[in-house]
Amino acid sequence: NGVWAAVPALKAAGLDPTKPATTIDAWIADMEKVKAAGLTPITMGMAWTQLELLETILIADLGVDAYNGLFDGKTDWGGAEVTKALGHYKTCVGFSDSSLYTEDWEPAMKPIMDGKAAFNVMGDWAVAGFDAAGKKAGQDYVYFPVPGTDGVFDFLADSFTLPDGAKHPGGAKNWLNTISSKDGQIAFNTVKGSIPARTDLTDEEKGKFSEYQRSAMESFAKDKIVSSIAHGAALPAKATNAMNDALTKFAQGASDVTALQADLKAAAAS
């Protein structure tokens, strides 16, 4: 649930990169200022990136308990609190560049890297993209929790499995042992931009990671953890795919908030 923001765009809009908004409404007000400065307020790509933005707005507007309730029936997808979140989502979509809706996350993040757009909501792998582009945290970009989600960690995990009947189980087991070792976790995650599943790294070993990754490790250790919808941690794939379809329809102007909410409720029940 991280926002990646372009320092040049924020400064052009008269915003202080070190003082991000703390509520969705305040964030939208900042987007208004970015738009007035002639820049794109927020970017998003294809449906799964749109769902990632939506889920973080749901976390912000509903809170942890009500957000988790969306997955066990305690929170109604058709309820007023979800309607409010979808209204905020609609506003954000209206601030975005629709030409990017068929692109993956990298092209949608490029305007942030180029300083031509202000905000993008994306997972921690974005830091690897900024590093590859030679961009510096604090100088070229800043990162902060989606406003209203401070103290929450929106979770997903990379997983490697040993399939039943694999032709080379020995090699697969060697890979699993390697990737789960300290050295394997450090080598994999420092390049990908993610954080280790292991929690036994020393301070010296943590020092091999970027500033962002170290902050994410601290967040994961102390914050309330919720499951990501967009990345399959909260709902079955069938439901997630149906939500992606609903957001694609909404982005294309083929549905309104009322229809989107009905589609999401039906998807969650599928």
Named regions from a protein language model:
Residues N1-L10, T40-P41, V142-Y143, P147-V152, ...:
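A structural signal for short loop-to-beta-strand junctions that line the ligand-binding cleft
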Residues N1, A26-K74, A117:
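Extracytoplasmic/periplasmic solute-binding protein
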Residues A9-L10, I28-A37, E106-N120, D245, ...:
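Short helices/loops that flank or line small-molecule/ion binding pockets
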Residues T199, R214-A267:
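C-terminal capping/gating helix-and-loop segments adjacent to ligand/active sites or protein-protein/ligand interfaces
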Residues A29-E32, D72-Y101:
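Glycine-centered hinge/linker elements that transmit conformational signals in sensory
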Residues P20-T22, L62-K84, A132-K136, Y141-F153, ...:
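Short, solvent-exposed loop/beta-turn-alpha elements that line the ligand-binding surface or hinge
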Residues K35, L39, N177-D200:
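Periplasmic-binding protein-like
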Residues G87-H168, N174:
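Extracytoplasmic/periplasmic substrate-binding proteins
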